[in-house]
């Protein structure tokens, strides 16, 4: 192989390594974003469940009050 071909091969290898490193960084960033999204999702689900329970409790109280009014 000529020196020129080896230089071209070396340059392509360097570019490939740089591309791989950039992709690895991007993967790490995406993993972090994914984890943050997962945590946010879990918090929202928990809050939603709490609000549903609270809503149900208010409905029960309202039904009870309406029942008392009907008995008057």
Swiss-Prot record:
Provenance organism: Histophilus somni (strain 2336) (Haemophilus somnus)
Pfam families referenced in this protein's UniProt entry, alphabetically: ZapB (PF06005)
GO BP, one annotated term: FtsZ-dependent cytokinesis
Protein name: Cell division protein ZapB
Matching InterPro entries: Cell_div_ZapB
Positions with biased composition (Basic and acidic residues): 44-56
Family: Belongs to the ZapB family.
Coiled-coil region(s): 1-71
Swiss-Prot/TrEMBL keywords: Cell cycle, Cell division, Coiled coil, Cytoplasm, Septation
One GO CC term, this protein: cytoplasm
Compartments, record wording: Cytoplasm
Quaternary structure and interacting proteins, as annotated: Homodimer. The ends of the coiled-coil dimer bind to each other, forming polymers. Interacts with FtsZ.
Gene that this sequence comes from: zapB
Residue ranges of the region described as Disordered: 36-56
């Amino acid at each position: 192989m000529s020196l020129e071909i080896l230089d071209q091969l070396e340059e392509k290898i360097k570019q490939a390594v740089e591309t791989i490193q950039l992709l690895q960084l991007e993967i790490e960033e995406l993993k972090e974003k994914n984890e943050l999204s997962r945590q946010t999702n879990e918090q929202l689900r928990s809050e939603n469940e709490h609000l549903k329970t609270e809503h149900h409790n208010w409905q029960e109280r309202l039904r009870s009050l309406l029942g008392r009014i009907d008995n008057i």
